[in-house]
Amino acid sequence: MLKWFIISCCLLTAISYSTYYLFTSNSWIKTVKTHTYSRFYQLIKENTKTQLDRLQEEAKLSGKSLIPPFINFDREYAIAPKYNISICRIKKSMSTLMSGVACVLYDTGKFMRNNRSILEVWSHRFCGEKNEYRRMNEVKWRMGDAHHTFKKIVVIRDPIARFISFFSNKCIFEAQKYPDRKQCYNCQGNVTCFLEKQYERFVQHSSDYSRIRPSYEDKHAAPLSWNCEFGKFLKDYKIIKLAVDPKDRKNGLANLMNVLKESNVPNSTLRFIEKSALEGETMHATYDSDAHDVVKKEIENDKKIREWLKRIYYLDFVIFDFDTTFINS
């Protein structure tokens, strides 16, 4: 009897110790947390995919198919390893400004000594290709030991505002300046003509068997979700919504400053970036031009144009949580 009592006590002690170790082990807790967070984000991803699939199916049934999201189409990264930051630049989404921000963070002293601007023309940008990469894998390699923890930042803007800026700059200003290029499919400033042709090109690009080369127009007009390898890394990004007009830029810029501050960017550098961004504008800014106002008014007054824009950009509104009131009007 005594023998069985001693054996039972030993077993209970062993079980108690094992249970205590299991629930207090940091590695075990870390594994559970990782699994829980991973599953949480997976559920969000699955729910979002279901919603996007449903919207696409409804549009298809109505004969107005939407351009699908998350095509791995265009990628431009500028990095600042000192602060473990990578900035993805999206064309016509303050890409010139963000290129300048990445550059001043890359080598602040040299940037300041040379009296450079974060808004300088793209072709004369100070850092050039010194801190620029085309693939996230290249960025991870360059980040070295920080490749698991570096911060991914991207600036986006309302898809319709972005389109108006693109069309005013590329399909009116540049098309008139360089007529021999027959830019924007030679539509001569006709918004409907351009959207019809661009929609068909995006349909081809989204095909698994597409062999057409991305054009200048494709890259500038592509849906937001086709950039930055969002299909793989969307949940990892710090997403900043930033308006182009300096009067409306303050809130988004404050968010950007907070994100940079989290990465220990000095206050003096933050003040320089904020002051430059609020007081200046890039060479390609169109928000206060006559062409911008004409295109904006045309979109507001023409339901057919809004329908084409919806077919191309509607899922951007959903994915990045922009107000859909206007696009649905």
UniProtKB/Swiss-Prot annotation:
Residues the entry annotates as binding 3'-phosphoadenylyl sulfate: 91-97, 157-165
Pfam families from the UniProt entry: Sulfotransfer_2
Designated name of the protein: Carbohydrate sulfotransferase chst-1
Deletion consequences: The tm576 deletion mutant is lethal. The ok625 deletion mutant has reduced levels of 4-O-sulfated disaccharides, but increased levels of 6-O-sulfated disaccharides. Increased mortality in response to oxidative stress.
Cytoplasmic side: 1-3
Disulfide pairings: none
Lumenal side: 24-329
